């Protein structure tokens, strides 16, 4: 641990926030339907999509219609992706001859990519063909990300509205975000990745002879194109089982830097766009400050813990002051720490190291970031509306303390909004703790678990936290490709995505119908340090109190076991 490591973490976080501002201003223009510099090329394509699909771009939808459109689109996406995975053996671009996925694995994988989770219970390079990767998984990396940003746009319009029922048009938002934002950025980033050494090919796997004279199969895929949207859309599912620790997905420190920035930049950009459209830029800066504080603290804790000696190495009298187990030497501890904080705070789930090999507090911090709600800065779109839900609860608490009806950005926050907000917030602990409790006692779940005790419980907790939080990363350490794990994790992903989105859209519909109030001397300020502190407190209380007993039995107990081992 040295000053260069701290400087690296600060630089990457600062660069990400800085790049979020211009992207946020561009995103605001998309949400408003304003003209952009891409219009001469993409406007005809946009009109063609509307005409082919029978979409009226002038029609605004109520919150229930918007939610139904989102659910219908997601259901159709699930059916299509499930069919591709099941029929993979009969589809083209499959030179390896991979068979179709079993029903429970296809179910889990289809839900995973439709819900923007990208949990993978399989070894990608030995299971999924190039066609399934491109037509199935990569395309849904775009669509699931665009759907999340569309919901954020609807929530933003609710705060800008004055006694209105419409939240915009889901199909228009989905189309514009995909065409004008995700696709152009992904093309540029993919070309950069190819230039930096990532493969982009449809060729079959190559057999090579190693220096030891052993035959080795080298998997080849169109990696760069999926890697670009994988990180930009906070998807996280990799072409290779090692994910971004694999040299084909993340060959050098420069690609590592780009991928970290990709993970968080659109999360910050959504908040910037929100502030511009609601005319609340100072309030947006307050939200960004909260997000950046959590990412910085998490990265610092992980960096500190992972530069401690590993007890196994100390016991073997090995000279190792840093826990480099499961980490890539080409990145080092600082880049691994900021990556881990970014990927768990952003619902991305892509990894450049193996979290199961982290020290207990390092892995516990990664898990805690997910359990806080994936709002720091969160997934594309979902981070913004998740933070708005907690901001509403924060101003409600402030209103109770001073005896006034709470307001947030000119909208009264009343019982209806608070009930919907609490319904959304409770989805996470109910699914995580409920499924984890069942998995900890049922033989059908435990039979695939390789570790027992505190670490085994941590692996179970992390799996359901990752699935419900739509993150997708894993501690691993157990066989996830079984009917129990594939089914229950799939259900957890559904609850975490759609069980949260529907109450959020209901809140948006309720707020849009209310009058826009003017700020008075009695209005609680939501752009200063007092609100920032209150919001941090609400986030910690909701995350800490709900999950602390479970964390105490998992990573915290394991930490003290490590201290005991080091003291011997």
From Swiss-Prot:
Pfam families, alphabetized: KdpA
MF term (GO), any: potassium ion binding
Membrane topology: Multi-pass membrane protein
Compartments (UniProt record): Cell inner membrane
Keywords per UniProt: Cell inner membrane, Cell membrane, Ion transport, Membrane, Potassium, Potassium transport, Transmembrane, Transmembrane helix, Transport
Residue ranges crossing the lipid bilayer per the database entry: 7-27, 65-85, 135-155, 177-197, 254-274, 286-306, 383-403, 422-442, 489-509, 530-550
GO CC entries: plasma membrane
Family: Belongs to the KdpA family.
Function: Part of the high-affinity ATP-driven potassium transport (or Kdp) system, which catalyzes the hydrolysis of ATP coupled with the electrogenic transport of potassium into the cytoplasm. This subunit binds the periplasmic potassium ions and delivers the ions to the membrane domain of KdpB through an intramembrane tunnel.
Subunit relationships: The system is composed of three essential subunits: KdpA, KdpB and KdpC.
Protein name in UniProt: Potassium-transporting ATPase potassium-binding subunit
Source organism: Beijerinckia indica subsp. indica (strain ATCC 9039 / DSM 1715 / NCIMB 8712)
Encoding gene, per UniProt annotation: kdpA
